[in-house]
Amino acid sequence: MSLTSIICGIALLTIGEVGPQNMPDTIEPVESPFVMPLFERPVFPESTILVRMEQEGISTKPIQEAIDSMSCRGGGTVVVPPGVWRTGRLILKSHVNLHLSEGAELHFSGNIIDYLPAVFTRDEGVELYSLGACLYADGQENIALTGKGKVVGPPTSCEIYKRNESMSSDKGIRKPLADRIYDGKNGEGVFLPKTFAPINCKNVFVEGVTFERGLYWNIVPQYCEHIVIRGLQ
């Protein structure tokens, strides 16, 4: 048997042992030599909003309005039905579960304007203001991204990627934080958005979703507490 065959066989075994198809319903306790919190699946209010797709253009507005409305009402689940949804940056809010139905695909825009205004984020350890993430949250509690749907990042042929070519987080490190704003205006470049990157959040839950084609890091919780990420592809 060739080395290539052995490597392929190991890869197939590994793929077959991970992902949502092999994910148990229960979250097992973490065994460690020190005290760990009990990780549990979050419980959201029973309220549900089913998002309606825009007939033309991108669907950022109806999805974001559903998230905002649900959070203001005390929380619940925002359901994205099957279909290809073109969208800009979405901001998750407290006590809301964004649920991607099987067959639902969020295809994120590659245009800078769809990620404005600039938001607080980090790039290579440097705090600054830029595009943030496709799925972003700041200072929220009890947020979730669940379901059997798919999150598809922008292509590398997009405007955002091209406007990042000369950017380095080192250029802003000597400026005060308030001056580290990179929103693409006045010919300025931008920092690439991560795919899922909450910051300063508590109780973050991600389960079952497939991530495909990201411009930068896919899943990057920053300054967050009590995070559960399981069964992803």
Task: Enumerate the predicted regions with their spans.
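Extracellular "leader-to-stem" segments immediately downstream of a signal peptide or signal-anchor
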Residues: 4-79, 84-87, 93-97, 101-200, ...
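Metal-dependent enolase-superfamily TIM-barrel catalytic cores that perform enediolate-based chemistry
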Residues: 196, 209-211, 220-223, 231-233
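Surface-exposed loop/turn segments connecting beta-strands in extracellular beta-rich domains
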Residues: 87-88, 153-154, 213-215, 224-227
